[in-house]
Amino acid sequence: MKSLALFPLALALALPLSAQALGRPTFGFSAQLNAPLGNLKEDTDKTLGAGASFLVQWNFTGGHAVRPRFDVNVFNVSIYEPSHSNYRESRDLSAVGLGVDYLYYVGGTPKGLYLTAGAGVTRWDLSYTTSDQVGNGFSSSYDRSKNTTSLGAAAGLGWQFTRVIGLEARFVHSPYKAFDLSDPTSTTRTDVNRDGNFLQLAGIFRW
């Protein structure tokens, strides 16, 4: 399983060597909103997540492209903010991933409608944060525990409006482990698998 999990990373590192004769890569950044589904929707109380990605893309002839990516996505699990107080505590589920996407541009060139599918490795973490301000004093605490590292997959479609601006929608599957929902301060995982499904809408900017 570990060797399979390292495959997308090895592929991403090998791509620059294999694509040197096909032109220079383009670099990009995406900002995304994530709508949780299934188990993730239950664990985050239907709260939208947010994230960002760094992208490198090699374009091939015939509308084909390969795109390694580095992703950071965060979902809020719970927030506690008592009235008439500056005290705040929150739990967040974060996903940091490295993957590779295949893109196919329907028109044969890197513009307009395209389809995409990919795979990658994701590390999930659960964090607990508190902050409080009394007068001129400020205090905070932070605790984070690794939840799991898992293989994931994604598929979707997008539209490249210009050479710089694009919009993409993807379904992402990236399993994680369940945690104690009844204790808002806990970052401990269990051995129960959760599906980790979400829909992602991303604005993409390339240069």
Feature annotation, model-predicted:
Residues 101, 135-148, 179:
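Outer-membrane beta-barrel porins/channels
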Residues 144-146, 150, 155, 188-196:
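Individual transmembrane alpha-helices with interfacial aromatic-anchor signatures
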Residues 32-55, 143-148, 182:
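Surface-exposed strand-loop-strand hairpins of Gram-negative outer-membrane beta-barrel proteins
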Residues 165-171:
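Conserved active-site loop/cleft motifs that coordinate metal ions or position small ligands
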Residues 37-43, 83-90, 137-144, 184-191:
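Extracellular loop and loop/strand-boundary signature of outer-membrane beta-barrel proteins
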Residues 22-26, 33-35, 50-136, 159, ...:
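Gram-negative (and chloroplast) outer-membrane scaffold detector with strong preference
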